[in-house]
C-alpha cells in the first residue's frame, strides 16, 4: 500500500515516506562532525529544567514578524500536534531541507535522547543537547525547515530558540487534546492538558506565530472536498487527509515570509482571489462568534453565501462568558481553533474583531493589547485595532502585525457631539491614518435618520482630505435606524448569518444589542437593488445546443440565495448572428460561450484577458460600460466595480475560466506527496480547446514538463508549438520567470508509444477526449497502463461527464489504492462556473450551493445535448 494511504495530520512517519521513495532525501545534518571538531562547552546549566509554565517564562523580547525570504522556519509544540507533517508540507512547498532535531541528536551522538540521558546522566545530556541544538541552528539558518522536539525546550534550549526567533520565524503549533491523545495513547487526556497548560507560556515566549492544527480524519472531510459522486470517486479520501492542512499552513507561511517561485501552485486562481476585498465596493463580512464557530452552532457553508469576508468576533470581557472562565490558555485555544475552523472551511479572507466593551473594564486575566497580539500571531488577513488604546500600546501592536491589514476601529458608545459633521470623527480618521492603519472604522449609535446621509458627506470630506490615497473608510450608524447606513457602507459591512442559530443571537460580553449586525447579506443585497444602486441583469449561455446545460440551474439558484434579481438562460444558435444583438442589450450582464464559438468570438472582443490571449479561446464575455474602466483595463478592480449596472455597452471583454476550473481540480486532487516540483510531469490527452486550457492550467501551476498526446499527431504538435512559442516570447502571464527557461510542451507520437525513458511518469493527467466520435461511436478511451506508473500516484481529471463513468474512470478506479485521485467533469463544471460567477457579478460564488445544484439536476438524459459541445480529438 502507498505510504500516504492512512496518514492523518500528526501521524509520525519518515520524510522518505512522505516525499515518495524516488525523491531526494534532505542532506544529513553535520552536527556530529561539528561536535567532533569542537569540544562541548561546560558552561551551560547542568540541571535539566522541564518546561513547566510560568516558572520558566523567559525574559520578554520584542516579537519579530518580518524576515528574509530564505530564513529557516522552525516549528515547535508539545508532542502529537503534527509538527513533522507540517514540516514536510513546508519543506515540499518551499523546496527546502527538512531537518528534525531528534534525528540530528541521534546522528551526532549515536543514540536517542532517552538512551543518551540514561547512559551519561542528566548533566551530560544537558551539555550535549545544548551544543547539538546550537550547532543545528547555526548550520541550518537558511533555506531549511527545522522540526524541534518538545525536549529541545529543556534547560538552555528555550533561550536558544527564543533568541533564534529574533531573526527567524518560529511557529508554535497547537492542537486539541483529543487529537493529541489519538497520537500519544499512553498519556491520558488529563495529563496532556496539564502538559499543555504548563508549557504554553514558554512555547509562546519562544515563538512569534501560532498555528492551530485541526484534527481531521478521512471521515471528517467536508462535502465540498470529499467524494460527491459515489460511482466515480469512492476511494479518494485516504490520500487527501493532509491536503487541507497543507492549504491552511501554507496560507500562514505566505503571511509570514511571502511567496516563492512555485507559490502559484498553492494559490487560488479565481479572479476575486487576486483582489484585496477592501478595494471592492459594497462588500460584506458575516459576523460569527468564536463560541458559535467552535460549537458548530453555525452552518459555515450557509453563513458564507453572499458575503466577501468572515468576521470572527472575540469577546474581551473576562468577567462574563465561558470564553474567559478558564483563563488565557482556554481563550487562546478557543480563538485559535475558531480561526482554524474558518480557515479550513472558506477561501474568504478572515477579519478578527475584538468585541467592543462599553465599560472598558481593565482586564484582570488578559489585557486587550495581549489579546490583539495573539490574534496577529495567527496571521489573519485583517484584524481590528481599538484606537482608544494608549499610543505606546498602539505603536507596539502595529509593529507586530506582519502582513495582516489593520482596521483602526473607534466604536462610539454614545452619539458624538456634532455627529458625523464635527471634527471628532475626522480626528479619529487622521489618528488611524497617522498610525499606518490600512482601513479606518468609525461607528456610533443612530441619532436620527439624517445621520444616514451625513455619513455620505463625511466620506466625501475624507476623500477630499487625502485625494483618495489614504486608508479606506468604514462608517455607519448602529441600531435599527442605522440599518440604512449599514446597507450603503462601502466596505466590509458586518452582517448577520442567514440562518438563525438554535438559540437567539445575543451580544458578546460588553456589547449592547444595538451593536449587533441587524441585516443579513441577502437583505443588504436586496436593499441595494431596491434603491437602484444595483440593477437586474440578464445572463446567458450561448452555443450550438445548450438547452441541456446545467449552468442556468447553478447561477439562478445562486442569484436567488444572494438576493440578486438576475436571470440566466440558454440560447442555442448555429451562428453568431443572435449573439451580436444580445450582447448590446442594456441589461446584458455576461455570457458563457461553448462550442463551436470559443474561437469564433475572439475577433468580436474589444479587449481580451491575458489568459484568453494565451489559450487562444474564450468561454466568458462581459460587457464594459465605463470609459474609465476601458481605458485602464489592466486594473481588474474596475471590471468588478461596474458589475450589476445597466446601460449602453461600449466594449466587450473576453476571458477564459476553463483553465481555472481544470487548475482547481488538479490542485484539489494533487496529494502533498505529489506537490509540484521541477521534475514533476503533466500529461494532456487531446488537442482541442479544452486541451489548450489544460496546458495553460499546468503551466500556471509551475509544471515544467508537459506532454500532449492526440490521435492526430499533427494537432498535438501544433498545440505544443503554440505554447513553446509563447514561452520563448514570455507571452504567458501565469508562467513564473524562473520557470520559463525549463518549461516545455512536448507532443507524444501516439497513445501506443512508450513513455519517454528520461522523464518521470506523470502525476497530473487531464483527458479532454470526448466519449463519442462525430458519428456517434464510443471512443472507449483509456491510457496505457505503463503511463500511470508514478510510484506516488497522482491526479486524473476526466472532463467528460456523459456518461459520468467512462472507461478512463474505471481504469483509474482500479488503481486508486496506489495513490491515484480521480476528478471528473462534474468537479470541473462548477469550478469554472465559480470563476464566471465572480466575473459576472463581482461577488464570490456560493460554492456548496452551486455544487449541490449540479448533482440535483444531473442525469445522463438531461445532458444528452452536452455531447454536441465537447471538443473534437
Predicted feature residues:
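NTP-dependent small-molecule kinase module
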Residues: 2-68, 89, 93, 169, ...
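Conserved substrate/cofactor phosphate-moiety recognition/catalytic segment
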Residues: 88-134
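Glycine-rich phosphate-binding loop used to anchor ATP phosphates in small-molecule kinases
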Residues: 124-167, 562
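Conserved phosphate-donor/acceptor-positioning beta-strand/loop module used by diverse small-molecule
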Residues: 162-186
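Catalytic beta/alpha-barrel core
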Residues: 287-289, 309-318, 328-331, 351-357, ...
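Catalytic alpha/beta core domains of metabolic enzymes, predominantly
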Residues: 388-536
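Phosphate/diphosphate ligand-binding glycine-rich loop within oxidoreductases
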Residues: 536-672, 811
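Rossmann-fold NAD(P)-binding glycine/threonine-rich loop
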Residues: 623, 639, 773-854
Amino acid at each position: 500500500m502507498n505510504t500516504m494511504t492512512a496518514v492523518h495530520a500528526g501521524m509520525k512517519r519518515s520524510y522518505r515516506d512522505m516525499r515518495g521513495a524516488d525523491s531526494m532525501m534532505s542532506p544529513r545534518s553535520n552536527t556530529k562532525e561539528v561536535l567532533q571538531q569542537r569540544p562541548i562547552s561546560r558552561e551551560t546549566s547542568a540541571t535539566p529544567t522541564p518546561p513547566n509554565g510560568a516558572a520558566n517564562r523567559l525574559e520578554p523580547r520584542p516579537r519579530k514578524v518580518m524576515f528574509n525570504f530564505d530564513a529557516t522556519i522552525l516549528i515547535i509544540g508539545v508532542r502529537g500536534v503534527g509538527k513533522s507533517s507540517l514540516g514536510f508540507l513546508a519543506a515540499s512547498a518551499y523546496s527546502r531541507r527538512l531537518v528534525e532535531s531528534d534525528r540530528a541528536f541521534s546522528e551526532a551522538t549515536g543514540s536517542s535522547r532517552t538512551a543518551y540521558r540514561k547512559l551519561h546522566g542528566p548533566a551530560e545530556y544537558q551539555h550535549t543537547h545544548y551544543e547539538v541544538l546550537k550547532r543545528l541552528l547555526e548550520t541550518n539558518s537558511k533555506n531549511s525547515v527545522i522540526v524541534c522536539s518538545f525536549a529541545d525546550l529543556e534547560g538552555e534550549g528555550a533561550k536558544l530558540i527564543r533568541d533564534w526567533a529574533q531573526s527567524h520565524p518560529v511557529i508554535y503549533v497547537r492542537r486539541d487534546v483529543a487529537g493529541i491523545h489519538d497520537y500519544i495513547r499512553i498519556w491520558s487526556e488529563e495529563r496532556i492538558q496539564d502538559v499543555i497548560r504548563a508549557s504554553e507560556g514558554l512555547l509562546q515566549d519562544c515563538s512569534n506565530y501560532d498555528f492551530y492544527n485541526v484534527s481531521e480524519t478521512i471521515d471528517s472531510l467536508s462535502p465540498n472536498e470529499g467524494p460527491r459522486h459515489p460511482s466515480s470517486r469512492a476511494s479518494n479520501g485516504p490520500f487527501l487527509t493532509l491536503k487541507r492542512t497543507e492549504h491552511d499552513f501554507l496560507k500562514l507561511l505566505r503571511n509570514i515570509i511571502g511567496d516563492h517561485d512555485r507559490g502559484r501552485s498553492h494559490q487560488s486562481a479565481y479572479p476575486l482571489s487576486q483582489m484585496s476585498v477592501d478595494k471592492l465596493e459594497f462588500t460584506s463580512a458575516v459576523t460569527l462568534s468564536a463560541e458559535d464557530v467552535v460549537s458548530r452552532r453555525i452552518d459555515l457553508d450557509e453563513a458564507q453565501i453572499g458575503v466577501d469576508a468572515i468576521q470572527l468576533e472575540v469577546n474581551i470581557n473576562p468577567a462574563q462568558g465561558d470564553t474567559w472562565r478558564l483563563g488565557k490558555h482556554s481563550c487562546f485555544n478557543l480563538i485559535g481553533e475558531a480561526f482554524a475552523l474558518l480557515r479550513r472551511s472558506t477561501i474568504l479572507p478572515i477579519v478578527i474583531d475584538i468585541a467592543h466593551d462599553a465599560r472598558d473594564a481593565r482586564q484582570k486575566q488578559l489585557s486587550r493589547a495581549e489579546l490583539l497580539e495573539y490574534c496577529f500571531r495567527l496571521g489573519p488577513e485583517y484584524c481590528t485595532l481599538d484606537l482608544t488604546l494608549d499610543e505606546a500600546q498602539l505603536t507596539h501592536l502595529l509593529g507586530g502585525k506582519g502582513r495582516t491589514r489593520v482596521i483602526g476601529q473607534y466604536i462610539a458608545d454614545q452619539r458624538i457631539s456634532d455627529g458625523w459633521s464635527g471634527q471628532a470623527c475626522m480626528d479619529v480618521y487622521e489618528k488611524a491614518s497617522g498610525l499606518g492603519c490600512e482601513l479606518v472604522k468609525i461607528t456610533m449609535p443612530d441619532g436620527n435618520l439624517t445621520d444616514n446621509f451625513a455619513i455620505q458627506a463625511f466620506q466625501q470630506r475624507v476623500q477630499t482630505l487625502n485625494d483618495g490615497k489614504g486608508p479606506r473608510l468604514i462608517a455607519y450608524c448602529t441600531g435599527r435606524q442605522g440599518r440604512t447606513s449599514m446597507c450603503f457602507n462601502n466596505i466590509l459591512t458586518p452582517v448577520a448569518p442567514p440562518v438563525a442559530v438554535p438559540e437567539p443571537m445575543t451580544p458578546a460580553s460588553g456589547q449592547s444589542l444595538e451593536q449587533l449586525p441587524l441585516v443579513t447579506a441577502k437583505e443588504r443585497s436586496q436593499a441595494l437593488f431596491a434603491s437602484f444602486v444595483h440593477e437586474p441583469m440578464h445572463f446567458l449561455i450561448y452555443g450550438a445546443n445548450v438547452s441541456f446545460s446545467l449552468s442556468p440551474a447553478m447561477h439562478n439558484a445562486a442569484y436567488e440565495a444572494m438576493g440578486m434579481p438576475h436571470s440566466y438562460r440558454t440560447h442555442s444558435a448555429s451562428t453568431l448572428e443572435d449573439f451580436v444583438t444580445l450582447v448590446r442589450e442594456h441589461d446584458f450582464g455576461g455570457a458563457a460561450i461553448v462550442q463551436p464559438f470559443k474561437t469564433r468570438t475572439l475577433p468580436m472582443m474589444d479587449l481580451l484577458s491575458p489568459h484568453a490571449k494565451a489559450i487562444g479561446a474564450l468561454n466568458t464575455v462581459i460587457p464594459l460600460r465605463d470609459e474609465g474602466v476601458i481605458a485602464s483595463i489592466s486594473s481588474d478592480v474596475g471590471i468588478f466595480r461596474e458589475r450589476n449596472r445597466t446601460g449602453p455597452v461600449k466594449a466587450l471583454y473576453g476571458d477564459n475560466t476553463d483553465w481555472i476550473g481544470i487548475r482547481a481540480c488538479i490542485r484539489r486532487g494533487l496529494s502533498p506527496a505529489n506537490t509540484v516540483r521541477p521534475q514533476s510531469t503533466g500529461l494532456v490527452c487531446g488537442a482541442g480547446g479544452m486541451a489548450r486550457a489544460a496546458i495553460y492550467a499546468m503551466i500556471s501551476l509551475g509544471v515544467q514538463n508537459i506532454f500532449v498526446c492526440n490521435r492526430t499527431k499533427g494537432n498535438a504538435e501544433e498545440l505544443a508549438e503554440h505554447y513553446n512559442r509563447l514561452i520563448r516570447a514570455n507571452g504567458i502571464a501565469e508562467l513564473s520567470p524562473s520557470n520559463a527557461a525549463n518549461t516545455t510542451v512536448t507532443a507524444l507520437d501516439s497513445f501506443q508509444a512508450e513513455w519517454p525513458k528520461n522523464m518521470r511518469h506523470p502525476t497530473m493527467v487531464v483527458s479532454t477526449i470526448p466519449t463519442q466520435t462525430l458519428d456517434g461511436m464510443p471512443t472507449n478511451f483509456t491510457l496505457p497502463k505503463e503511463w500511470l506508473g508514478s510510484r506516488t500516484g497522482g491526479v486524473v481529471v476526466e472532463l467528460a461527464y456523459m456518461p459520468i463513468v467512462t472507461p478512463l474512470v474505471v481504469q483509474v478506479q482500479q488503481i486508486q489504492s496506489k495513490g491515484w485521485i480521480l476528478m471528473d467533469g462534474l468537479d470541473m463544471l462548477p469550478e469554472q462556473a465559480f470563476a464566471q460567477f465572480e466575473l459576472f457579478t463581482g461577488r464570490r460564488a456560493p460554492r456548496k450551493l452551486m455544487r449541490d445544484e449540479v448533482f440535483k439536476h444531473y442525469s445522463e438524459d438531461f445532458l444528452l445535448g452536452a455531447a454536441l459541445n465537447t471538443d473534437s480529438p
